[in-house]
Amino acid sequence: MNLLWTGGWDSTFRLLQLLLVHRVPVVPWYLEDPTRASTRIELQTMSRIAAHLRDAFAHTGALLRPIRIATVTDVVEDADIAAALREVRRRSYIGSQYAWLPAFCKQHGIDDIELGVHVDDKVQALVRPYAMEFDHPAGYRSVRVDPSHSATPEYRLFRYFSFPLFHVDKLGIDREADAQGWGGIMDMTWFCHTPVRGRPCGLCAPCVYTIEEGLARRVPPSRRVLSFFYRRLALPLKHPLRQLRASLHSRAGRRGSGRRDEPRRGGLGAGAPRNPPP
């Protein structure tokens, strides 16, 4: 089973389900983003969790395959996927990882990799109208985008993934992990993209989601206070500013396209196209 593993809450919980409940071989994938400040911590976290699993559950040594690491900068941009992402973002903004994750899968011929998308996740809300449940050969139920919606941008973007945590939220994961005795392992996970002195910042998107979805205890108290004011004063402005920026970019593109159709006066001769403005 292919699993996108980051060392985070959702993907680690899914790893534990696959290894300790379903007992199936797992190939974990990690896409390294050199611009992300948390990359080193994420890799160290996964290494610690894998070592703990091998020590505590001997059978996982054979089931958990070596992590496969690829670099985001090596992913070739795919025009169809980029167009689908632009279309989806007109309705709901989702992160840049959905530009390179599906492109990576397409580039490497991966047509079923599990993602830890869960209730309260933006992607869960996007996929829900197009979702279908299916029986996985490994003996569990999962969710993916129904091929009957192949004409939609949602299908083009998410067709490579399955979503086994589709019907559970972070608190549900917390309860299930405690019931299984996995609480200590889950506390080893990492989620912050921009750590401050090695601790969660409280301001990045994963920190905000962690707080708002019921796991505020995982963020240091001082950063929770800062996050409170950030979420009430600054965060509400991000979406309208993003929309304004996209609108201005679109208008500039249309003006640039119009100018490229005009004849150039002199220089290269009549009818030569203008260079696009910088």
PLM region descriptions:
Residues 1-4, 9-277:
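Nucleotide-activated chemistry modules centered on ATP-dependent adenylation/adenylyltransferase
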